[in-house]
């Protein structure tokens, strides 16, 4: 966070709370947090074994990378990330932030990344937990997940659920959905504007062609 932000607790839940007046000035109705649960920051790549026994001495040394984004299956999904807390109690600090957002008329949404190794029932359990424990208003769910499991869950009936691609036709057919809480998180406009601001070529179509039309083209409909 830039020093001009005026935030004392940069990179923390308290810091977000300090920016609430700014969010209100922007006129937004809520904020979407990237993964803010506890996840593994240290990513170690596997060592490459030599093709022949005598080449083992020459194998690459293990490289260590830092994961600052949180999009990994190596996570402890039930607790707020301690590294984003300005106090010794990240749970209390996160809850205080959510309450402050609600008092200001703002919603708090979160991104959750699930990899292919996780059981669908556990994914649902995690999202339910954050809804009940932390009063999160919505979730952007990333990964190969069973959308129907979330969209038809009564506990999440009034919870915003965002997916990269929402297959409403398959899930609902010609019927009216019981809970109108699902939406497609389409990043086309976001990336189009980013490319235009960078001065990239051929960005006009990327921005002005309706996103729905492009999505249907990608899906082959």
Named regions from a protein language model:
Residues 31-33, 108-110, 139, 161-163:
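Hydrophobic faces of well-ordered beta-strands that scaffold small-molecule active sites
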